[in-house]
Amino acid sequence: MGKKSRAVPGRRPILQLSPPGPRGSTPGRDPEPEPDTEPDSTAAVPSQPAPSAATTTTTAVTAAAASDDSPSEDEQEAVQEVPRVVQNPPKPVMTTRPTAVKATGGLCLLGAYADSDDDDNDVSEKLAQSKETNGNQSTDIDSTLANFLAEIDAITAPQPAAPVGASAPPPTPPRPEPKEAATSTLSSSTSNGTDSTQTSGWQYDTQCSLAGVGIEMGDWQEVWDENTGCYYYWNTQTNEVTWELPQYLATQVQGLQHYQPSSVPGAETSFVVNTDIYSKEKTISVSSSKSGPVIAKREVKKEVNEGIQALSNSEEEKKGVAASLLAPLLPEGIKEEEERWRRKVICKEEPVSEVKETSTTVEEATTIVKPQEIMLDNIEDPSQEDLCSVVQSGESEEEEEQDTLELELVLERKKAELRALEEGDGSVSGSSPRSDISQPASQDGMRRLMSKRGKWKMFVRATSPESTSRSSSKTGRDTPENGETAIGAENSEKIDENSDKEMEVEESPEKIKVQTTPKVEEEQDLKFQIGELANTLTSKFEFLGINRQSISNFHVLLLQTETRIADWREGALNGNYLKRKLQDAAEQLKQYEINATPKGWSCHWDRDHRRYFYVNEQSGESQWEFPDGEEEEEESQAQENRDETLAKQTLKDKTGTDSNSTESSETSTGSLCKESFSGQVSSSSLMPLTPFWTLLQSNVPVLQPPLPLEMPPPPPPPPESPPPPPPPPPPAEDGEIQEVEMEDEGSEEPPAPGTEEDTPLKPSAQTTVVTSQSSVDSTISSSSSTKGIKRKATEISTAVVQRSATIGSSPVLYSQSAIATGHQAAGIGNQATGIGHQTIPVSLPAAGMGHQARGMSLQSNYLGLAAAPAIMSYAECSVPIGVTAPSLQPVQARGAVPTATIIEPPPPPPPPPPPPPPAPKMPPPEKTKKGRKDKAKKSKTKMPSLVKKWQSIQRELDEEDNSSSSEEDRESTAQKRIEEWKQQQLVSGMAERNANFEALPEDWRARLKRRKMAPNT
């Protein structure tokens, strides 16, 4: 009888917090705990001695009641179910002691619900128990079950049963059709506690899967029905389909139930969870667990959570489920700490707890989870798993195996947590107060919750596939069935934020259970999918030759920053994480600035002008140009002065653009150049880099550190020696030039410190020719005549002059100033100042593009991608004004001559870019060659062989880029051209006759129709 009684208890519909004892086959149906008001499980047991199942149920109810003090509706419901379950009265195996109830303890625990409904359930359970005791007639059970199921349906959206990976019954599976539900509930209840004699009236809860029960299926196959949330059985031979368990299988199931209550197909036993621990703290709760053979498996789902948490019990609320469950296992010190923590958390969480009685405290929940884990260990893990599988037959046997594995994992995790708890580290399990601050980190919280749920998943695991899929949604909010689960997730999130544990405890038992398994599965599935997609994409990129080696670290930083900001705006990224990453990026740039700045100089950011300026630490003088440390000071100073003047002028023309580009380019390029050429190349490379850097660094524009107002001297006034920047060239020309410049530079990356100079210069020459020829040619040709001379002079004097060649109509010597300003300024300045000065209105948009292009080109150069295009745009844009600046900048970096380009060519830097400015239609190759030779000499002295290799590769890449600029460049160029064309049309008055500028008349549709008809006629 012991076995039988065990099975019977397992059968009990009540999923109250039963002692950890194995619960026979508690129907997974009784989700609602049946804590009775009865204080002692013992009392309950005696009252139900006739049918041990009834007794068990009563005991469970009593225990629950005791813990709850007032029976909850759920409990009452559970009680009602009990009669159904207790059709065959087993001996009152349930001792008052939780241990006695062990058979159903786990299930009861899981089933125990902390809802106000529990009390009602208790009452109904008691009634049901009395009925069971009297006759336990199948009819009574049927009617009770029907009522119970109806109640459950009303109370909770049906939750598909998932195999209880851990001994917790799955959340209520979706209700099968009313008839089926009633019968299945009956059957499960009966099966748990039925005697073999009851076979006639015995019914199996079809919501529970037979997988894992270990019965021979023969010709029958179990099929899950999503609509009803139940399984139906299909005879593969006869093609017969039945909602009820076929006799062939029913006989086996009944036999199993009697012999292995814990593995009862009802899997109700899984509810037995850790009732013992629970019972110790709450004897009543434990008792309810014992009586845990809640019949209604659906309720069981709820009950499982409730039972597990039985948080509704006032005692638990005071004490905490964790305390109740773990009391026997945990040392006093830990208990006290938990108690203190719980009190703290409860105050904060009470509203949340109210939201979900089930989750009295997250801490409790966590603790409960641990006890459950322990209980699972105490209880028969295999049996629990079997029960879970049975109860949660919503999943295939395969899944059940997974559940078993998961259960084991969960148990392991819980054990570890328990150990940590014992060590006093409550935070591990999460029972310790969680950072209430984690709300912003709700994602982290969710992750933690999910992990916790993973633990709970043991119990929830059995949810039917449907429920699993639903639960899989992180919060389960997506599905009504998971209503509870969703709430649990939500609550758990809140709790996580407030006190991970408290909410989780109550709420998570049921909801988390349901969701945990699905979530764990979902997480694993998600991880798998992510890994698959990531591997595929990575492999494709690799095959296509797209790798990080082709771009600089700063490019990566820029893209990462942009992506993170976009994700953050979408709410998919933690703000604190983003802030930390942005700070890291800012720090990287800061290091770059420090390394790039020549000795004796400090680099500062001017927020107003959005560009760098440099302060001589000895003299305290400040300047926009990048100081050329390697060039002779005089040369560098002269160039810097000129550059400064030009830059300032250009800045005046378009301060905003210049500052933006200067900032980023100077920061990124300046430092790079400085590093490699100790400031020689800094201007040139910085300038090209600037535009892109601005974006990449996002630090500069987005996170630019405020310019130290007092420490750095104010940016130097633009020197007056350099001629004022020529008026902006015609918008079309300017736009084109800028576009070209931007395109080329945008595609390039800042060259490596060693190679920066050469690469930018060479690519710029090539690029300049190509791109500048395209759009700049017209403008350059016009400006080249005027600036050609200047450029020639500069080129001759400084290879840089070539760049300053007159790409823009007006030569912008801003190169030096822009360069000095900072490569960001230079970068932006190149386009903005070089071209921008020429065409300030057009240059602003173009400048922005140019910056990107330039940055890109520098980057490409740096990465070996599109150095040439960047340089080209560089040369083009700055040819008139900017050429000097661009070429000067690169040269400056190398020779610090750029400023001289337009105004007074300083001594030609050894590595001036060989390519003539595109606008001038390429200065004589001789000059370029000379410049290149100079550069080569410098590079030889400055650069290692690797750098040379890199530079040669860059040149090749630049040539390629020249032929086809990057998409970005193309887009920006096209946009610029359109804008320039619009400006031209408007300025020239052509717009009046251009239909593109006409406002669409209201009858435009009719007009369009007429037009279409005209050609036909």
Curated annotation (Swiss-Prot):
Q: Which residues form the WW domain?
A: 214-248, 595-629
Post-translational modification N6-acetyllysine, affected residues: 290
| Disulfide bridges in this chain | none
Known SUPFAM superfamilies for this protein? WW domain (SSF51045)
Where is the sequence biased in composition, kind Polar residues? 130-141, 428-442
Which stretches does UniProt call biased (Pro residues)? 706-732, 904-925
User: Keywords assigned by UniProt?
Assistant: Acetylation, Isopeptide bond, Phosphoprotein, Repeat, Ubl conjugation
Where is the Glycyl lysine isopeptide (Lys-Gly) (interchain with G-Cter in SUMO1) crosslink found in the sequence? 301, 348, 519
Q: Does the keyword Phosphoprotein apply?
A: yes
* Comp. bias regions, Basic and acidic residues: 491-513, 640-656, 971-982
User: Position(s) of the covalent cross-link Glycyl lysine isopeptide (Lys-Gly) (interchain with G-Cter in SUMO2)?
Assistant: 335, 348, 519
| A Pfam family recorded for this sequence | WW
Q: In which tissues is it expressed?
A: Highly expressed in the eye.
Supply one GO CC term from the record.
nucleoplasm
Residues bearing Phosphothreonine? Answer: 172, 479, 516-517
Where are the compositionally biased (Acidic residues) regions?
627-637, 733-748, 957-970
Q: Where is the composition biased (Low complexity)?
A: 40-69, 181-200, 461-474, 657-671, 764-786
**Chain positions with Phosphoserine modification:** 18, 116, 124, 427, 432, 435, 438, 442, 464, 499, 508, 963-965
What does the record's free text say on domains?
Answer: These WW domains interact with Arg/Gly-rich-flanked Pro-rich domains found in several WW domain-binding proteins (WBPs). The N-terminal WW domain has the greater ligand-binding ability.
Quaternary structure, from the entry: Binds FMN1. Interacts with the Arg/Gly-rich-flanked Pro-rich of KHDRBS1/SAM68. Arginine methylation in these regions has no effect on this binding.
Recorded protein name is Formin-binding protein 4
Q: Taxonomic lineage per UniProt?
A: Eukaryota, Metazoa, Chordata, Craniata, Vertebrata
